[in-house]
Amino acid sequence: MCNFAADMKKTNETIAALLLMALAPNAAFAATNCGVTGNNGMEEITGTKVTEKGITESMVAEKVVNASKASEKVVTASKASEKEAAASKAAANKVSLNKTAEKNAFKNNKVIGAKAKDNRITSPGNGLFADSSRVFDIDEVVVAVQPKEQYRLRMQPLSSTSLGARQLTSLHATDLRQLSAFVPSFVMPEYGSRYTSAMYVRGIGSRINNPAVGIYVDGMPVINKAAFNMHFYQADRVDVLRGPQGTIYGQNTEGGLVKIYTKDPFSHQGTDLHLGIGTRLWRNAELAHYAKFSDRAALSLAAFYNGQNGFLRNTFTGKRADNSDEAGARLRFMLRPTSRFSADLIADYQFTRQKGFAYGQFNPADGATEQPSTNYPGSYKRNMLLTALKLGYRAEGFELHSTTSYQLLRDDMLMDQDYTSTDYMHLTQRQLQNALTEELTVKSTTAGIWRWTSGAFLSYQWLKTDAPVFFGPGITQPISTALQRITYNGIVSAMAQRMMAQGMPQEVAMTRAQAAVDAAGGVSMSADMKVPGVFRTPQFNVGVFHESNVHLTDRLTATLGLRYDLNRVDINYDTKAIMALNSTVMGTAATRLVTSALNHGTHKAYNQLLPKVGLTLTTDESGSNVYATVSKGYRSGGFNIQMFSDILQTELMANARRAQQGDYDVPHTEADYDRVNKTIAYKPETSWNYELGAHLNLFSGSVHLDLAAYYMQVRNQQLSVMAGTYGFGRMMVNAGKSRSCGIEAALRGSALNNRLEWRASYGMTHATFTDYTDSLKVNGLYEPISYKGKRVPFVPMHTVGAAASYTVPFSKGICQWVRFGLDFSAQGSIYWDEANQYKQKMYALLGAHADVKLGVTTVSLWGRNLTDTRYNTFALSSAATGSTRCFAQRGCPVTGGVDVKIHF
């Protein structure tokens, strides 16, 4: 009888554990929900690992130990209850049951799936209609060091999207531009060059100067916006967080944050060789090696080459307008000398050389865009180095993390700024940037009702920009022609007056005077004009922050955060406009110079308090939750170096006639410099974000649904517009106020025993100006114009993304599995100007891929824009020619290729 009772007790415990396994997505949630930190930030792998063949291998020993430790923490915690301890024990039981299920899957079904980053665990079905499909959050499987966060993303009061290596490969996404189409309310258009890194989230974005979205790579903040548009390779995971993240990530994360994680050598072993070729001679090669010397040391080395011939051709030169070549290498060395201490050294170098800025004339009436036709083909070259040393120490009750980084960027850009075959003006820009950052964070790891994170951030950036602007005959010839006419008429008139004073009739005097001047060689003039300039703009930033998560009940958690951020921006400018007027007057040649030099400096300091308040309510044992958040966003102010050529050219035009008397240098007083400094400055942008959302785990964990609705109020919104009087170059202005509201929805699921995987997302953003008055030149006079009620430019109202793939496993032969997939994306409409006069209508793109796994080799066929949809990724207006004209860059046509990946 006693044995029967004991057996029944064991049976009941097993049934209870099975129920818990069905209800909860993973053991990590069971531990977290009862107040235990499942991921302490120092463990690189705490989730389920899937081998290359798709057979799941649970890291059971580590999970059991972690779950046991978690149980001990719960029991010993001052606020812990018996219920919490039981939940933690059940989590450990669940791990063991997962192991058993996975062994059965391997033994009985030979389950074949995807790689380690599939966000899922495969297990056998029972019965004809049984479906064991389950999806998991990627940060349960691809676990990286998180120095700041206390919870996984879908347990925080925020809206986010995560994609793993498998998803990146299926979408053939090699940078953020290609990835953004599958993230709701997020867009990074593909145009210009690698220098171009415009990103827009929820109506907030930036094309120049300070970014509105931040980027972290392996825990290191990328400082220079010109480095944002980088090539992905050996990426393990990408997280996109939407909404202000300033409380713990600081300024310039007003729209959101992108976190990129690369593969680490403790979790990945062996050598990867990737080769690819595609349409228009797209070519790619990658080689990576991961070596784990022991449980204490590991090393990875990786390198890549990527190139293409492009699809646009400059009709003026007859040469390609968007071909590119880039290459890079990465070193990562990780140490874990003790169970408490860790070190991670990263060095990442990338080189880019490409043609760029292939903008053709755009007709807003029918949306047609011509091939580019410029006399100066645009180009861009960049050398970029990102290095970081990350240190971690785990003590009793807390963790301490330090991230120190050094970043170098050196680039060289050439742009035809009139975008026509006539030589009006062109710009060269060379940047040299050095940056140092240091971030210290400490966070609690003990169980209880209060979890906290505190930290400090410090950065200093040296930036030197050499940006001369050259004006061609399209600008200088009208000036010299006007001066030539004035000089000629003046000489003829003076000579005729002397003849008339002697009694000669006026008509005869004028005719003889003209003949005399012409006989003596006449008057001819030409002008050369350029605006060289060197600008030094160092920036200093310091921030201190704290965030607390307080468990008000066993299901309700309050998040309270505050950051103080101080930013100082300096500018020291040494620039001048030089116009050389070459004249020949009646056989006498002379060169007169008109110059205007500006050599001065100024600075601005900005400080902000960035609060955040959130509530998260867990609704069931599977981890579903609803949340509400109020947070403040902030983008720092600064200076427009792009405006100097316009300012100086205006001064030259006003003083051009003085060259007739000799060389002339335009004087400047302190009052003049004060006006210049005020003209080039723009103010910080601030916003308040109000958000409601939900993270739901449905149908026994086979479907994840994320919902969010938000409302944002923006003050002093920063906009990139054409500079000043002549419309040369871009500058940043403050557009008064705007508001943005919208919804976001994302679904991700698995079916047919995890053979079918799918995801879909939708974002609607309605961003409009509520107070923005500018001036417009009408008949030579400036008149005020209001853009109130107009949509914010460059922001798509709708973003849609969907992808699905189906895997067919094989238990015999060299072929292990075949996978087919489709993806779909759409966005629009997008207005290109503040007046909403021209736009891109909503458009859709279709992609597909087919993959086959043959031993250690995977062969993939892929295609993009299979319907060959015609659309524009960017458009602008320019008045460089004297009249306003529109230019745009075409989106990529149908493309495709084949990839071969070998792992050994």
Where are these regions (language model features)?
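N-terminal periplasmic "start-of-domain" segments of outer-membrane beta-barrel proteins
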Residues: 119-125, 131, 135-171, 196-198, ...
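N-terminal periplasmic accessory domains that precede
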Residues: 176-179, 198-203, 216, 237-240, ...
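Short acidic/polar hinge/loop motifs at secondary-structure boundaries
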Residues: 218-244
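Transmembrane beta-barrel wall of Gram-negative outer-membrane proteins
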Residues: 270-272, 277-308, 312, 316-354, ...
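Solvent-exposed loop segments that connect transmembrane elements
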Residues: 313-319, 357-373, 418-425, 468-532, ...
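Membrane-embedded beta-barrel scaffold of Gram-negative outer-membrane proteins
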Residues: 390-415, 625-629, 642, 648-733, ...
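Gram-negative outer-membrane beta-barrel transporters
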Residues: 443, 453, 457-459, 554-558, ...
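C-terminal beta-signal and adjacent terminal beta-strands/loops
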Residues: 463, 476, 634, 755, ...
